[in-house]
Amino acid sequence: MQTKIFARLAGIGRARFVGTMPDKTKFISKSGTYPQGFSLNGIASGVKANGKKDLAILFSSRPCNAAAVFTKNAFQAAPVQVSRQTLNGCGGKDIHCVVFNSGCANAVTGEGGLMDAQLITAEADNLTRPHWTSWTENSEEFPSSLVMSTGVIGQRLKLDKIQSGLEHAVEDLGSTHEYWMRAAEAICTTDTFPKLVSRELSIAGKVYRIAGFAKGAGMINPNLATLLGLFVTDAPISVDAVRSILRHAINNSFNSISIDGDTSTNDTIAFLANGAAGGSEITKSSPAYKEIRDAVTDIAQQLAKLVVRDGEGATKFVTVQVRGARSEKDAALVASTISNSALVKTAFFGEDANWGRILCAVGYSGAAVNPPATTVSFIPADGTEPLKLLVNGEPQNVDETRASEILSQDELTVDVDLGCGPYAKTNWTCDFSYDYVRINADYRS
């Protein structure tokens, strides 16, 4: 009955508003340039009842320096706890594998869930150890695998399927674009397309490659979200530099997006560097550090934007640009409050230039605001002139036809100038459609 109601509502919405979802297949990577020394696979192990891919493994025969960032949700899933313990124990050194599963979050599953996550890392170590090129004391004392899970909360993993699936996945590891896509597909849940980005850069005559993939479409809010991600490079980067690069990349990408304001129990993004490209170790004081950091950040931003574009039921990609804030904190507060506002997001879906909702969000954000100095504009994606809605606190005679034209496009920018100071922040968000309600109402059915 509920499904019929939601379908009927969705039909009304599509008739009343613009109608069709934007084509998202254009965002799927068709080829790539991938780091040396990594191989991976993604398969259907049977965790998902629909037979889709649900298990992925990435392997480096060379030991990696590694770092990860995790959810701030108090109910941290078993894989989050186990991966954090692994990295703390080994000091971020000698990581060889990352195992992903989708379809079951292994969250709020007690001691049994922790044991399941530990068994998965042990199984990955046992299966790949014959292919390691070097051993250290860490290799003997600590696990060399990280684990990430996503899916329904409160259910135990089908451990027998995971273990059997890992055996099959390791038997057919590969490094071509096809294998990277398999892994990117295997971590998806409500995603409508796999998110994979890669690039190559040359620094002082050395060529390095960086790749990343991520999943996420709902329960997305800064400080990560229902979001799993992995960046890898063949550059020789020190542990401290790996940690610093990851923090910078995340703060300027995944911590600047929102789909629905919810933060998951499982958020994890890791960064591995295996040094297979050779050369001197890159530290935070190395000339190459900033170029590597900026390249990883660029990939992180591309992936973060893909997550927003794939927001559950999303029909619009919205950039929220805040300027003139008194502090960095104020700029971030205003950007995130606008991005999370259900009233703002539903207005975008309805293609309604209701700028009062934007102004309302600015006002309750908790940031320092000077109403007589505040200016709000829509910036079209086609490069034409911005449409001023409010200038120095004064409402403008808005051309509603032009406003509707801007809002009918798949992309737009909301520009807010607070007129209070020099600080700025950019976030990325999407609209709320009827399909968002349908997808989440039917999630477990």
Curated annotation (Swiss-Prot):
SUPFAM superfamilies: DmpA/ArgJ-like. GO terms for molecular function: glutamate N-acetyltransferase activity; L-glutamate N-acetyltransferase activity. This is Arginine biosynthesis bifunctional protein ArgJ, mitochondrial. The keyword Coiled coil does not apply. This protein may be expected to contain an N-terminal transit peptide but none has been predicted. It catalyses: N(2)-acetyl-L-ornithine + L-glutamate = N-acetyl-L-glutamate + L-ornithine; L-glutamate + acetyl-CoA = N-acetyl-L-glutamate + CoA + H(+). The record marks A225, T226 as: Cleavage. It comes from Schizosaccharomyces pombe (strain 972 / ATCC 24843). The alpha and beta chains are autoproteolytically processed from a single precursor protein within the mitochondrion.
